[in-house]
A protein has these predicted regions:
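AMP-forming adenylation/ATP pyrophosphatase catalytic core
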Residues: 1-84
Length: 84
């Protein structure tokens, strides 16, 4: 639980959305960066280069580049991307 392993935000590329279109950024969502991890409340923002920024309500442990971030709206999986 070292403080340097805590991240309050991440960037993600290679985005893929189940509905085929990105979800609107102005809504609250939850995200996971690890399998079986508890859903973490977050907000998203899209960057001009097509990537996404995810800002968590509380810092997340050991966010790792190259792994996936998966976005949810309640119980519905929206898609996600690769952490950069």
């Amino acid at each position: 639980d070292h403080p340097l392993l805590q991240r309050s935000s991440l960037g993600a590329g290679q985005l893929s959305w189940i509905a085929g279109v990105p979800p609107p950024p102005e809504r609250p969502y939850t995200a996971k960066t690890r399998y079986r991890q508890q859903d973490a409340p977050c907000r998203i923002a899209y960057r001009e280069d097509g990537s996404m920024r995810v800002d968590f309500a509380t810092p997340q442990w050991a966010v790792t580049p190259g792994q996936s971030v998966v976005l949810y709206d309640g119980e519905v999986c929206l898609g996600g991307g690769i952490i950069v």
